[in-house]
């Protein structure tokens, strides 16, 4: 028997993604990543051995059944555009499936580009309206997580919400970096503050605060009205978290969606993994998370694959040098096209086409594509940017004063090495 109940969960899970368009905000500079974003937008930064950061939001969309996607770009967009064209052009246009690139165009004024996250959507409203969506899923393109957006859409519809905000608990001392909310027992949002100096703790857990994940579901027509009103507001920063969400909350039209209800896990592990990799230390640590024996984020899950641009590369190779020293790795990710010769790599991530020459020791290090590590180098707790050529005998991560003089060293002691830094030596 066919169930015609419009709130039947199975029917909603099938239908709601087809009625939705996802908009990924991918124009951020990512200044806290320092030199990693000098030539690329933060969502285009390499991650996890073979991915780009934006691949997680894009893969979540596809795996959730959302196949109409807009990617809003602005800062240093060429690398991002090239990646999407090469890796995400397989959707079927005849079935109205697409990944649409939406660059900044100064649509309303030549005096400014995107003034905020809400303005980035507003300036593309003429295009977005033509998608004829019933629901808009607004996503950040710079977070690492696996989430079934169809479950959030179901929650949104069943509550009769105009706006739904995904949320998760974060330590109170870290909450000032997020939008923080208070909710009632039905998860209606009662109060919302963007990056407050004194975050409100959760009533049942005073050491934690309930933080926005920067993921929103809107009824499309309601969102269009909000954006049109906000566009001409002189006192607005034209930002979702700073302006629109507090306004919706004041009208009691916003609901919270706990990440626990839609987080995708695999096996018996039910840990909810979500990372903002906005700082060098967070980026380094999240990469090395994947090199652990049992990572909290499973990128090997065939039921929820993380897709990316595919390169035709030879297998990774580990060889001994002429002296008989064997190339070997332990607890590491090593991508295609890599060659490790007579060196030891421990708890590290090597992206495609990395060459590690003889007598090197590499520990707790993230090496981006096309890097050549000269003989007898020692690398520890560092990030090596793409296409760097490290000279023979270079030591990084052992002398804080020397590292700070030559490269960028974070407060946590993570060292970033870029081509421009090496050229100045």
From Swiss-Prot:
Pathway: Glycan biosynthesis; glycogen biosynthesis
GO terms assigned for molecular function: ATP binding; glucose-1-phosphate adenylyltransferase activity
The keyword Nucleotide-binding is assigned to this record: yes
Residues annotated as binding alpha-D-glucose 1-phosphate: 114, 179, 194-195, 212
UniProt function note: Involved in the biosynthesis of ADP-glucose, a building block required for the elongation reactions to produce glycogen. Catalyzes the reaction between ATP and alpha-D-glucose 1-phosphate (G1P) to produce pyrophosphate and ADP-Glc.
Pfam families: Hexapep_GlmU, NTP_transferase
Domain of life: Bacteria
Organism listed in the record: Pectobacterium atrosepticum (strain SCRI 1043 / ATCC BAA-672) (Erwinia carotovora subsp. atroseptica)
Keywords: ATP-binding, Carbohydrate metabolism, Glycogen biosynthesis, Glycogen metabolism, Nucleotide-binding, Nucleotidyltransferase, Transferase
EC number: 2.7.7.27
Complex formation: Homotetramer.
Biological processes annotated in GO: glycogen biosynthetic process
UniProt protein name: Glucose-1-phosphate adenylyltransferase
CDD domains with a match to the protein in the record: ADP_Glucose_PP, LbH_G1P_AT_C
Family of the protein in this entry: Belongs to the bacterial/plant glucose-1-phosphate adenylyltransferase family.
NCBIfam families linked: glgC (TIGR02091), PRK00725.1 (NF001947), PRK00844.1 (NF002023)
Reactions that this protein is recorded to catalyse: alpha-D-glucose 1-phosphate + ATP + H(+) = ADP-alpha-D-glucose + diphosphate
């Amino acid at each position: 028997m066919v169930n015609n109940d419009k709130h039947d969960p199975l029917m909603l899970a099938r239908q709601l993604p087809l009625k939705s368009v996802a908009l990924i905000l991918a124009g951020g500079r990512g200044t806290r990543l320092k030199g990693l974003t000098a030539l690329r937008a933060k969502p285009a930064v390499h991650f996890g051995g073979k991915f780009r950061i934006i691949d997680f939001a894009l893969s979540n969309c596809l795996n959730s059944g959302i196949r109409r996607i807009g990617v809003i770009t602005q800062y240093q967009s060429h690398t991002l555009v090239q990646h999407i064209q090469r890796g995400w052009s397989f959707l079927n246009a005849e079935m109205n499936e697409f990944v649409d690139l939406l660059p900044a165009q100064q649509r309303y004024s030549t005096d400014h580009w995107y003034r905020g996250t809400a303005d980035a959507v507003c300036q593309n409203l003429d295009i977005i309206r033509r998608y004829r969506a019933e629901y808009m899923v607004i996503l950040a393109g710079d977070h690492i997580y696996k989430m079934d957006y169809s479950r959030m859409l179901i929650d949104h519809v069943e509550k009769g919400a105009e706006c739904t905000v995904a949320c998760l608990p974060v330590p109170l001392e870290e909450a000032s970096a997020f939008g923080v909310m208070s909710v009632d027992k039905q998860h209606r949002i009662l109060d919302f503050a963007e990056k407050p100096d004194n975050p409100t703790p959760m009533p049942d857990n005073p050491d934690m605060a309930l933080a926005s994940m920067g993921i929103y579901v809107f009824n499309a027509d309601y969102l269009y009205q909000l954006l049109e009103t906000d566009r001409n507001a002189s006192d607005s920063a034209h930002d979702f978290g700073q302006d629109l969400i507090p306004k919706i909350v004041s009208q009691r039209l916003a609901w919270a969606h706990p990440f626990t209800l839609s987080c995708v896990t695999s096996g018996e592990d039910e840990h909810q993994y979500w990372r903002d990799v906005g700082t060098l230390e967070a980026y380094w640590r999240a990469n090395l998370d994947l090199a652990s024996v049992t990572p909290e984020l499973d990128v090997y899950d065939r039921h929820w694959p993380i897709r990316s641009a595919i390169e035709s590369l030879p297998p990774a190779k580990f060889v001994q040098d002429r002296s008989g020293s064997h190339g070997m790795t332990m607890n590491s990710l090593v991508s295609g096209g890599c060659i490790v010769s007579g060196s030891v790599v421990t708890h590290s991530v090597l992206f495609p086409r990395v060459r590690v020459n003889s007598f090197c020791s590499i520990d707790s290090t993230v090496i981006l594509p096309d890097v050549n590590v000269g003989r007898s180098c020692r690398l520890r707790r560092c990030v090596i940017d793409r296409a760097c050529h490290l000279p023979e005998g270079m030591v990084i991560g052992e002398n804080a004063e020397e590292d700070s003089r030559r490269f960028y060293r974070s407060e946590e002691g993570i060292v970033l090495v870029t081509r421009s830094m090496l050229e100045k030596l």
